[in-house]
């Protein structure tokens, strides 16, 4: 059924009353049983549902197809979604607080300016999402696959067994100043195409980056490594050395950085001479600190 028809069917005939019933139950967090809803591929057929601006609290939705549904500006608090499809759904400017998604897909969904806070996303596939100005706060992602991302901010989020498959442009992983270190564990970055990606205060535990020389990575103890690299760089008293020391200070000396946090930057984000000096001094600093037993 074409997308326009999926949407239109909720505004004609019996679809009007059916949409009202579905939205009322979603808002109250009650089950959708007994509404006579059809199924598609074994999932409750909610494709094209007009749920823009929905204010929903609690409840669990299991096994629903919400492809092409409209959740723009919705506020979903404590709602748990399991085995649901949100493929090509519009969740722009939606706010998802608490709750979470498990074994769901959001292929080519629109998540522009959406806010995710305090939930758990497990085994979620986000291939092809539109992510401009998406923000996530205190959210745990496990087994989740991320596509290329642009203008995304993750604050105090944890990532376990996740995979980032594409370019990261102005994507920020912010963990500084949290009571416990924020974690990237068993995470793979398949692409080194980073442009102003920022890792600030995130602990790296078995994190894989492409080994193609495009990135400068300090897998642990960046604060100590940056301090030692700054001392090593004093051999260079020229503008390149000064630029590097300034850059390292800006990234390592702000309050709240844990002693164990890792760090990474794209060489393209630095002037070529500064990038070359950064790579060599940070490498030498790590070697010295390992030899001294300061870092593992």
Where are these regions (language model features)?
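N-terminal capping/linker segments that flank leucine-rich repeat
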Residues: 1-39, 222-296
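Tandem repeat scaffolds
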Residues: 4-12, 16-236
């Amino acid at each position: 059924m074409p997308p326009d028809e999926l949407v239109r069917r909720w505004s004609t005939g019996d679809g009007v009353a059916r949409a009202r019933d579905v939205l009322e139950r979603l808002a109250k967090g009650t089950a959708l049983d007994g509404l006579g809803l059809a199924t598609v591929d074994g999932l409750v057929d909610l494709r094209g549902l007009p749920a823009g601006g929905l204010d929903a609290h609690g409840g669990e939705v299991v096994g629903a197809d919400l492809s092409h549904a409209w959740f723009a500006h919705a506020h979903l608090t404590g709602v748990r979604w399991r085995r649901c499809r949100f493929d090509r759904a519009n969740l722009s400017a939606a706010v998802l607080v608490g709750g979470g998604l498990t074994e769901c897909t959001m292929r080519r969904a629109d998540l522009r300016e959406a806010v995710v806070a305090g939930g758990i996303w497990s085994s979620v596939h986000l291939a092809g999402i539109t992510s401009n100005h998406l923000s996530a706060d205190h959210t745990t992602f496990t087994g989740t696959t991320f596509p290329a991302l642009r203008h995304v901010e993750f604050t105090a989020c944890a990532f376990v067994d996740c995979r980032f498959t594409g370019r990261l442009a102005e994507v920020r992983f912010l963990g500084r100043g949290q009571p416990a270190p924020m974690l990237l564990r068993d995470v793979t970055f398949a692409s080194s195409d980073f442009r102003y990606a920022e890792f600030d205060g995130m602990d790296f535990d078995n994190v894989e980056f492409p080994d193609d020389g495009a990135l400068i990575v300090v897998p642990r103890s960046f604060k100590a490594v940056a301090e030692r690299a700054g001392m090593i760089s004093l051999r260079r008293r020229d503008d390149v050395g000064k630029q590097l020391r300034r850059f390292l200070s800006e990234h390592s000396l702000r309050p709240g950085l844990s002693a164990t946090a890792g760090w990474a930057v794209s060489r393209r984000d630095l002037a070529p001479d500064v990038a070359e000096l950064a790579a060599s001094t940070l490498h030498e600093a790590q070697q010295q600190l390992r030899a001294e037993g300061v870092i593992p």
